[in-house]
Amino acid sequence: MSKGTLFDKVWDAHTVQILPSGQTQLFIGLHLIHEVTSPQAFAMLRERGLTVLYPDRTVATVDHIVPTEDQARPFVDTLAEEMMQALENSAKENGIRFYNIGSGNQGIVHVIAPEQGLTQPGMTIACGDSHTSTHGAFGAIAFGIGTSQVRDVLASQTLALSKLKVRKIEVNGTLPPGVYAKDVILHIIRKLGVKGGVGYAYEYAGTTFANMSMEERMTVCNMSIEGGARCGYINPDDITFDYLKGRDFAPTGDDWDKAVTWWRSMASDADAEYDDVVTFDASDIEPTVTWGITPGQGIGISEPVPTPESLPESDRAIAQEAYSYMQLSPGTPIKGTKVDVCFIGSCTNGRISDLREAAKFAKGHHVANGVKAFVVPGSERVKVQAEAEGLHKIFLEAGFEWREAGCSMCLAMNPDKLQGDQISASSSNRNFKGRQGSSTGRTLLMSPAMVVAAAVNGKVSDVRELS
């Protein structure tokens, strides 16, 4: 059993009681809500005559169903408009802080909370969204929850949870040129499998993560769930504190000093005990692209699509399914695969540093004929910052569309969707069948820089070769 880890410390600090079931009733320090998983939860509260217990610990925004082109109200999609109105009314009714379109603070929930300093070390955080593990980059324990659990947190500010085991994932060394945080997490998921983390919290450690910026760390923690882990985190350090200082909800004055002292104390002890330890060498990682229908089906850009014989027997059935769905033949190079759509954005890679890096490669190039390419900032703040730096002009001159903030093509809940059997190069986090809006649409996951290379060449390319 793990002991002395950040996970243990945060868990213990937020334990209300041990329930008869053996589960822990855990206090939730911050509850993030959006328009998709909250309407039913609020309806259940009304049915029982309940109100939100701690509205000051709840923050709402809209992201999943928001159009990124025409945001005029009412939305063309009547269901989306209905969901918008439901959250607007529920937030007002319960006194919940709500960041609506045009507020200057709206955006993908996992982008806006960190950028405003809402996400802090030592917290427990819950949200009705799979990628809540993003917030673990700050040394928080963050869980994605279902609608009934959203109801529970609204009503009681607690969750009934079983304690997880802790796996330490060490990556050491300097990342080679053209290799990013996205490649690191895709590599980890490839090696450990999409079910490898079931029952675990992942602690990311080692010199590679220590040298990452906060936004890079968020990319890594964001995809913990894709490896089966319920949450993933990185111990807070000076990089964390420097990022937080001065943000809207960060402590100030003496409270800041006290907070930093406490945050440091929550980091895993040097002699912490883990349930499992796995190590990787950063020099073994190259630009990575998924070829199949799970985030675990990734390969380096120099590798061919794997043959069934090269895979463990347990992976062969889904590989056969992937060959058929993706229309890719085993043994053929992934490099050179034609793409139709290129998407940069999402809670994985829609932050300002992602856009800066993508713009660096887009500058002086142009999107290939026949390719639709677009960039979607993760928040209104990111969009304003990008435009202040002139990044939008670089993208527009290169033939990319420049959109409003939202989840966009990460998932098929808004107008940004694939058509027919189009294939996309995407900086998002999931490549499941039909994920991007078409039952036959195909998704290749990669870093924003690699998406630019694909857009420019009209095919999967090595960004290191983009002149």
From Swiss-Prot:
CC cofactor: [4Fe-4S] cluster
EC number(s) given by UniProt: 4.2.1.33
A GO term for molecular function: 3-isopropylmalate dehydratase activity
Gene3D superfamilies: Aconitase, domain 3
Keyword check for 4Fe-4S: yes
Annotated residues for binding of [4Fe-4S] cluster: 347, 407, 410
Superkingdom field: Bacteria
UniProt xrefs under InterPro entries: 3-IsopropMal_deHydase_lsu, Acnase/IPM_dHydase_lsu_aba_1/3, Acoase/IPM_deHydtase_lsu_aba, Aconitase_4Fe-4S_BS, Aconitase_4Fe-4S_dom, IPM_dehydratase_rel_enz, IPMI_cat
Cofactor: how and how many bound: Binds 1 [4Fe-4S] cluster per subunit.
CDD domains per the UniProt record, alphabetical: IPMI
One example of a Gene Ontology biological process annotation: L-leucine biosynthetic process
Pathway connected to this protein: Amino-acid biosynthesis; L-leucine biosynthesis; L-leucine from 3-methyl-2-oxobutanoate: step 2/4
Keywords, comma-separated and alphabetical: 4Fe-4S, Amino-acid biosynthesis, Branched-chain amino acid biosynthesis, Iron, Iron-sulfur, Leucine biosynthesis, Lyase, Metal-binding
Catalysed transformations (reactions): (2R,3S)-3-isopropylmalate = (2S)-2-isopropylmalate
NCBIfam families: leuC, PRK05478.1, PRK12466.1
Assembly mode: Heterodimer of LeuC and LeuD.
Function comment: Catalyzes the isomerization between 2-isopropylmalate and 3-isopropylmalate, via the formation of 2-isopropylmaleate.
Family: Belongs to the aconitase/IPM isomerase family. LeuC type 1 subfamily.
Protein name per UniProt: 3-isopropylmalate dehydratase large subunit
Gene from which this protein is expressed: leuC
